[in-house]
Amino acid sequence: LTAPHPQLIAIGSIDPQTRGIKGAIAEIERAVKQLGMKAINLEPGFGSPPLKADDALLFPLYDVCDQLGVPVCLMSGPTSPALEFTDPAPLARVARAFPRLPIVCYHGFYPYVNEVIGIAFRYENIHLVPDMYIFLPGGNYYVEAANGFLADQLLFGTSYPFRAMGQTVEDYLRLGFRDAVIERIMHGNAERVLRLGV
């Protein structure tokens, strides 16, 4: 789908519960090596049964992504089947076990904003994409953290189609990010994490 559109990048989604571990690993390798996908998306809290990010079933997938040099993207918002699967505490175990693996957290583990910011402070391989949740109560803490230590760990996102892309760009630019960090948030961090210049 993205081949005719060089301005787009592809991210592969893998469900180890439907494919099995060997099948999931094979699909990750195919997605990265053959299809040129830039990251692998996992949605553990939406599995059947739902899993936490540090479930042992996921560790072989983290390992192969680490070996291939591609980030893992985790779905981490309040729409999971139960809020316990949005708790970011298990994320710390994954970040500690795979310190070179970039972990990109869609929806920024909202509503656990302060907790995930604290974990990201400890583990520089954690990257937050608060997307539409940055506009909800408590979202200002993402901005405050990005204006300090989190400048290289926050990435822009929209949650499209739930929020219009153009409007989200305009709204992000009005959130109060310092001039020194806004370029990183809007594109520089994503370019680095996804290795788009490589």
Locate predicted features.
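Catalytic pocket-lining loop regions of alpha/beta-barrel enzymes
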Residues: 35-39, 48-155
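Conserved, mostly hydrophobic/aromatic
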Residues: 31, 40, 65, 107, ...
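A generic structural motif
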Residues: 42-46, 131-133, 183-188
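Short, surface-exposed amphipathic charged segments that create phosphate/polyanion-binding patches used
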Residues: 25-30, 143-146, 197
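Residue-level preference for long, well-ordered alpha-helices that form the structural scaffold
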Residues: 20, 54, 83, 178-179
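Mid-to-C-terminal alpha-helical segments outside catalytic/metal-binding sites
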Residues: 30, 150-153, 163-198
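Structured beta->alpha junctions
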Residues: 16, 83, 134, 160-161
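Mid-domain alpha/beta scaffold segments of enzyme catalytic cores
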Residues: 1-56, 64, 126-127, 191
